Amino acid sequence: LKGVAVNDQAEREAGTRFMPKFDDKGLLCAVVVDHASRAVLMVAFMDAEALAATRATGLAHFHSRSRGKLWQKGESSGHVLEVEEILVDCDQDALVLSCRPAGPTCHTGAPSCFYRRLEGDVLQPVKT
């Protein structure tokens, strides 16, 4: 890894210290799963502010790339995501948020943003 000391890399991969590795835009990938079913609900991005807000409140916050600002999932709909657990990948550049959703997760009203399956070149609905 360019710019990362060997000790930092070893600590990041095998240590116990949380050392989030944000990309060049200051973001981490966050995969949200349902705490009960483990179904994938959505994928979003977190910056340091969103990560801090999530950890402080227990509610999922993300960075809106289109609006360039912090947003709490469900802030207008009431369909918040209560975070039960945060899993960190080996490089500490991606997270899994295990959440209890307070309603549909997708802005379309679907329980999950992953409500279609690719079959050839056609999207087919899946039961979510």
Name the predicted role of every residue range.
Residues 3, 7-28, 33-41, 46-128:
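C-terminal binding/interaction regions
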